[in-house]
Structure formats: structure tokens, C-alpha cells
Design a protein with these regions (language model features):
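Low-complexity, Ser/Thr/Pro/Gly-enriched N-terminal "stalk/linker" regions
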Residues: 1-44, 65-66, 70, 78-80
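Aromatic-rich carbohydrate-recognition surfaces in CAZymes
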Residues: 42-68, 73-165
Length: 165
């Protein structure tokens, strides 16, 4: 790619990210995230948000931080579901396809590859300084490292990130 093509690609990426940005307040908490595909995937998705934050770091560092803070805010005792249903309710058809505890659950019950500490280090700073990231890793160790070998067990195939999307 030449410099002109790189500039055009960067402008296109910037436009798509800004177009897909969602911001609001839910349960008294300010949130902001990039919807992977507003029509089909309108909510916050764990590792998509990690990758979005890394890109936002170069375009708008405040959005980068907010994207990851929004992901952390969805944590329940350290578990961060692979989807946080922010901004619009989950319809019945989707509720039947996603692993959720109840129809009105704020997140799925399944996880995605734990890329949060890596994304935080690339986008915000030292992840060891953020206690909720440590809580997340403690939860993963306690509930998904079943043999104590630092390898996480998956409950269903989508948790690997190798799904049909």
C-alpha cells in the first residue's frame, strides 16, 4: 500500500468507528462502546471492544479508555460475559440463541478469550493498576483453570472466539 491508500484506509476506519459508536447511561452508569455491526451486533462484545479500544487509542484516547471501562463495568464478581446488552433490550429470538441466565440478564453467561489486560496495556496503561482486571483474572483462574495449568476450559465453542461470525 502506498501512503495515499493508507490515508484513505485510515479515514474509512475512523468513519466506521465513529458511525458505530454508542454512548448512554444504563442503571446510572455512563457507557460508551463501538457496536461491531449496528444492525446485527448492536451490543458490546468483549473481545471486539478490546480490539476497538486499541484502534481508538490512535484516534480518540478518551473513547479508548471508555470502551474498556464500559467492558469492566459489566463485570459481576470478576466474570465478564462475552456480550453486554447495553442500549437496547435483548429480543426473544436472540435470547434463545445466546447463553443467558434470564431473559433480562445484563450479559451472557459465557466468556470470550481474555484479551482485556492486553488491550488495557496497549490503550490505557498498566493493567496491574486496575483492580477489576485482577478480579477478572482471579475469576478465570478460579472457575475456568480447572487443572491449575493456566489453560482455560471452555464451556461451549463460541468462547474460543472461533464462532460463525
Amino acid at each position: 500500500m502506498n501512503e495515499s491508500q493508507i490515508t484513505q484506509l485510515a479515514a474509512l476506519c475512523n468513519r466506521v468507528l465513529r458511525q458505530n459508536w454508542r454512548e448512554g447511561v444504563e442503571n446510572g452508569t455512563h457507557y460508551g462502546y463501538t457496536a461491531p455491526s449496528p444492525g446485527h451486533y448492536p451490543w458490546l462484545w468483549y473481545w471486539d471492544s478490546c480490539f476497538h479500544a486499541i484502534i481508538w487509542r490512535h484516534l480518540d484516547p478518551a473513547r479508548s479508555r471508555l470502551e474498556l471501562e464500559t467492558l469492566l463495568a459489566s463485570s459481576r464478581d470478576g466474570v465478564i460475559g462475552h456480550i453486554a446488552f447495553l442500549g437496547q433490550p435483548l429480543n426473544l429470538e436472540r435470547a434463545m440463541r445466546y447463553n443467558i441466565a434470564t431473559r433480562h440478564a445484563p450479559t451472557t453467561s459465557t466468556i470470550q478469550p481474555p484479551a482485556l489486560a492486553w488491550a488495557w496495556s496497549m490503550s490505557v496503561g498498566d493493567p496491574r493498576l486496575e483492580s477489576k482486571i485482577q478480579e477478572h483474572h482471579d475469576w478465570l483462574r478460579a472457575h475456568r483453570d480447572l487443572e491449575g495449568d493456566n489453560l482455560l476450559w471452555l464451556i461451549q465453542p463460541d468462547e474460543s472466539g472461533m464462532d460463525a461470525s
